[in-house]
Structure formats: structure tokens, C-alpha cells
């Protein structure tokens, strides 16, 4: 997907040619592959790159520095501004790229990503300034493209870009933690192509052109994405799309997030879509989220039609959405319904949710095709502080819908030793 160069050189020779120095003190790094963490491995010293003083395009030099890394080594970007005229690829396994205080400035909307191809690699601390006035759909137009296994993207700031901010394309055992994504023309964070065991935690996403966080499983992927934990993120404002969405996928948990200011769609959507030929969605937990200011007139973008979706919307086309638990969420200021089930949506529990200032039905039951007692169950929901009746007659409710969501024991451990508090050089606190 990304053009790469095959030139290689010894570390010392590259240091002279590229103007970067080798740190005098070795680091304790992680050699992580296939989800296995090996801490404090003996590795080569840090390699350090510096921005060109004249502001010239540095992409070729940076790619040579990346290619020269040894397994387990870290490349440190010294603080400053780096002009990068094409995409970069991290190909070596078990290396770390650290850039706290460094900004990479893209100049080509079609070719501006950092592809994290090597297994067990880490990208931490960089600020990526994107470019683009027209929305694009290619991996090379994203800002970070995760294709390897055991990849972690930590504390990266993405400002602008023609496509998605962070694009997880088939990666496994991936951690997307502590990042800030703003003003991309497509999704903020997008997980697809059969990605497995993905942690999306503690990120801030603002003002995107489409979904702020999305898990999408297309039939052409060959397998649905699964075991995804979306937790503790702060999301606000997008021109189109939803806040958090699972459109096809299995074993997903959406918990403890704040979702605000979604202008045209649902705050949280779990769906199967015919128009995009997606897989069904099943075994999804939606718990303890705050969902507010959804499709309000004052925030609507001119020329963008509102979808009429609920604040938390579960819907299916010709496929199915099954086994969804919507529990203990706070839903405030939604123009349409609070929670809705639409189409072939069965095995849903809606319990313990607090709803206020809802413009439509608090719980809209529009499911079809479900067996008796298998459409919706639940209790203890409130509207404006007043208890709501159960979403189905007690006698018709199924005894239990088995919904577990993501298996958190299979999530990757975050490489905290590679993180810093911005501007202070100290280790970050685990999110």
C-alpha cells in the first residue's frame, strides 16, 4: 500500500549520513510479538534524529533511519518540526518510535501515513500535522496505518488529515491508547479487516468528518473484527456519522466513554448495514457511557440531513444484531429516541439507564423477526427521574441474554515504560 525503499546501511554509517547521533546510554525496551511482552531486553542504544535546520523535506532521511533500526531499538525524534513529503513505514519488528515534542508536517494529502507494519512496534508521542481539503479513502491518506501484530500507538496527536486518523487494518493484539485525534476528514479511529484483540482506551477525538471511533466488518474482509474494548474515551463533535459505532463485529465492549455533540447520527450505534455489505453484529456491551447533545438543531451542520437515529441505536438491514446489553448509561439531550431497536435486532437487554430531555420515545422498540421473549428485556430505566415501565412485559422477557462483550484478559498490556508526560519527561500514569 505504501511505496518503500530497500536501501539499508549499518547504524554508524547511517548516523553520519543522516546527522543523527547514537545515545550513550542503552534503553530497556520491549520485545513484544504475538501478544507476548518481554521487558528489559538487551538492545542497541537509542538512535536520535533531528529536524533539518532549513526545513527541507526529510522523508527519505527518516525512512533510512527507520530501516536501520535493529530489533528492540528505539528511534527518538528530537523536539522540532520535520517536513515529510511522503509516507513512512516502520518495518522492523519490536522497535519503538518516540517523538514527544516533535511534529511531522505532511505535504501530500495522498501519501501521508506512518505504516506500523512490523510486529511488536510502538509509536509514541509524535504530533502528526495532516493535510487535505478533500476526503480520501486510501490507507496512504490516513495518518497512522496499523497492519502489524502487537502494535501500540500511544500519546500521538493527530491534527487534520484527508482520511482516518488511526486506521487499524487487520492488526491483532493492538493498543490505541492516550491519543488525541482532531479535524480528520474521515473517522477518528477506525478498526476493520478482521482486526482482533484491540484496545482503544483513553483517547480524545474531536471534530472529525465521520465516526469518531468505528469498528466496521465488511463481508469482503473475510472475517469480522472482534474482541475490541473501547473504554474511557472522550469524543465530541463530528460533521457526519456517529460517536462510537460497531457496524458488523463480535465481542465488543463500549464502556465508560463520554460522547457529546454528534450532529447527524447516533451517539452509539450497533448495526448491520446492507449498503456497505457488513457482517452481523453480536455480543456487544454498551455500559456506563455518558451520551449527550445528540442531533440537536443548534449543532446541526448546514446541508447535512439528520438520520433520526436514537442516542443509542441498534439496527439491522437484512442481517441481524443479536445479544446486546445496554446498561447503566446516562443519556441526556437527544432530539429523537433515547434507545432504539430497529429491524432484526434480538436478544437485547436495556437496564439501569438514566434518560433526561429526550425528544422522542425513551425506549423505542421496533424490532422484528424475533422469537417470543427474545426481542428485548430489562428494567430499572428512568426518564427525568421517573421510573419507566419494563421495555417488555415481565412474563414475556427471556430469563437471560448471554452478553459478555470483549474478553479483557486477551487485551495487550500497554507499554508504559515507553510513555512520557508531555513536556516533563516523566512516565505517564496508566489510563
Where are these regions (language model features)?
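N-terminal low-complexity, Pro/Thr/Ser-rich intrinsically disordered segments
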Residues: 29-48
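Acidic Gly/Asp/Thr-rich repetitive segments characteristic of extracellular carbohydrate-active
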Residues: 47-78
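Right-handed parallel beta-helix
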Residues: 98-103, 119-130, 149-160, 172-186, ...
Amino acid at each position: 500500500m505504501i511505496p518503500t525503499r530497500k536501501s539499508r546501511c549499518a547504524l554508524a554509517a547511517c548516523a553520519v549520513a543522516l546527522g543523527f547521533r547514537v545515545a550513550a546510554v542503552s534503553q530497556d525496551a520491549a520485545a513484544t510479538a504475538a501478544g507476548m511482552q518481554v521487558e528489559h531486553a538487551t538492545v542497541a542504544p537509542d538512535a536520535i534524529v533531528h529536524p533539518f535546520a532549513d526545513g527541507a523535506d526529510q522523508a527519505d532521511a527518516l525512512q533510512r533511519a527507520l530501516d536501520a533500526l535493529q530489533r528492540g531499538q528505539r528511534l527518538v525524534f528530537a523536539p522540532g518540526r520535520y517536513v515529510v513529503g511522503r509516507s513512512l513505514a516502520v518495518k522492523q519488528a519490536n522497535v519503538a518510535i518516540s517523538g514527544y515534542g516533535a511534529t511531522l508536517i505532511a505535504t501530500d494529502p495522498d501519501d501521508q501515513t506512518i505504516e506500523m507494519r512490523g510486529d511488536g512496534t510502538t509509536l509514541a508521542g509524535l504530533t502528526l500535522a495532516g493535510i487535505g481539503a478533500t476526503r480520501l479513502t486510501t490507507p496512504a491518506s490516513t495518518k497512522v496505518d496499523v497492519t502489524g501484530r502487537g502494535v501500540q500507538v500511544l500519546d500521538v496527536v493527530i491534527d487534520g488529515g484527508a482520511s482516518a486518523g488511526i486506521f487499524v487494518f487487520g492488526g491483532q493484539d493492538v493498543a490505541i491508547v492516550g491519543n488525541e485525534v482532531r479535524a480528520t476528514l474521515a473517522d477518528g479511529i477506525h478498526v476493520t479487516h478482521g482486526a482482533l484483540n484491540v484496545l482503544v482506551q483513553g483517547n480524545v477525538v474531536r471534530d472529525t468528518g465521520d465516526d469518531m471511533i468505528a469498528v466496521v466488518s465488511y463481508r469482503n474482509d473475510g472475517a469480522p473484527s472482534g474482541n475490541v474494548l473501547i473504554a474511557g474515551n472522550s469524543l465530541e463533535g463530528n460533521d457526519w456519522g456517529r460517536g462510537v459505532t460497531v457496524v458488523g463485529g463480535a465481542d465488543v465492549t463500549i464502556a465508560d466513554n463520554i460522547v457529546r455533540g454528534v450532529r447527524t447520527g447516533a451517539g452509539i450505534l450497533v448495526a448491520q448495514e446492507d449498503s456497505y455489505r457488513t457482517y452481523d453484529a453480536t455480543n456487544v456491551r454498551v455500559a456506563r457511557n455518558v451520551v449527550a447533545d445528540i442531533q440537536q438543531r443548534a449543532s446541526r451542520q448546514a446541508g447535512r440531513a439528520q438520520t433520526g437515529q436514537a442516542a443509542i441505536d441498534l439496527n439491522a438491514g437484512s442481517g441481524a444484531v443479536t445479544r446486546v446489553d445496554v446498561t447503566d448509561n446516562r443519556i441526556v439531550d437527544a432530539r429523537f429516541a433515547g434507545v432504539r431497536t430497529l429491524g432484526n435486532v434480538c436478544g437485547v437487554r436495556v437496564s439501569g439507564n438514566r434518560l433526561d430531555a429526550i425528544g422522542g420515545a425513551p425506549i423505542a422498540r421496533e424490532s422484528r423477526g424475533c422469537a417470543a421473549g427474545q426481542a428485548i428485556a430489562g428494567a430499572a430505566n428512568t426518564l427525568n427521574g421517573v421510573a419507566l415501565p419494563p421495555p417488555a412485559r415481565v412474563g414475556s422477557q427471556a430469563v437471560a441474554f448471554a452478553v459478555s462483550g470483549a474478553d479483557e484478559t486477551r487485551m495487550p498490556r500497554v507499554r508504559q515504560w515507553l510513555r512520557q508526560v508531555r513536556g516533563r519527561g516523566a512516565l505517564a500514569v496508566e489510563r
